[in-house]
Amino acid sequence: MVMAVYRCAKCGKEVELDLENTREVRCPYCGSKILYKPRPRVARRVKAI
């Protein structure tokens, strides 16, 4: 069982989906097909040249 957390583009709610058993990826709240993988809240520091 692979559970993944996504954020809906239309309503903005976080959705947890089982990708192995689900054929169609949709938001269960609004029915939107556009889901984004949320980025981690860790700030990255890049060394300037």
UniProtKB/Swiss-Prot annotation:
Q: What is its EC number?
A: 2.7.7.6
GO molecular function, one example? DNA-directed RNA polymerase activity
Per its record, the protein catalyses: RNA(n) + a ribonucleoside 5'-triphosphate = RNA(n+1) + diphosphate
Q: Please give the GO cellular component terms listed in this UniProt entry.
A: cytoplasm; DNA-directed RNA polymerase complex
Main localization, broad class: cytoplasm
> Which SUPFAM superfamilies does this entry report, sorted A to Z?
RNA polymerase subunits
Q: Which residues bind Zn(2+)?
A: 11, 27, 30
Which named protein is this? DNA-directed RNA polymerase subunit Rpo12
Q: Which organism is it from?
A: Thermococcus onnurineus (strain NA1)
In which compartments does the protein localize?
Answer: Cytoplasm
Give the note describing cofactor binding and stoichiometry: Binds 1 zinc ion.
Q: What assembly does the database describe for this protein?
A: Part of the RNA polymerase complex.
